Amino acid sequence: MPQTILVVDDSPTIIKFVSFSLKNKGFQVVSACDGMDAIEKLSNLSEGVDLVITDLNMPNLDGYGLIDTLRQNESFANTPIIILSSEDGDDDRQRGLDVGASSYLVKPFKPQKLISEVSKYLN
């Protein structure tokens, strides 16, 4: 059974690009347009997800809030979370890691960098 990755971003273009890159490597992809949508999708997935990739700046519930919510839920407390954001300041990176992200990638990015990062957490 393929491993499942949740991709959360308010940009349909980013979702398509990331999803395409991941599907080409054999991953199953579920997408959400913001943190609230992600939480709803996760509640409807009986198997959960193996990894989350999230943007930071999104409407309704941003990436920081999503990560914090997931880390408080024992089902997702140890799920790897990769931030994929255009925010490249040290403060943004540190805040993301402090709230519970596993790693932080900056947009724009190369697909191979994303796949390499995902591969650190999934086999």
For each predicted feature, which ranges?
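Charged docking surfaces used in two-component/phosphorelay signaling
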Residues: 16-24
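Acidic, metal-coordinating helix/loop segments flanking the phosphotransfer/catalytic sites
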Residues: 31-51
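Active-site residues of response regulator receiver
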Residues: 55, 85
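Receiver (REC) domain active-site loop signature in two-component systems and cognate sites
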Residues: 58
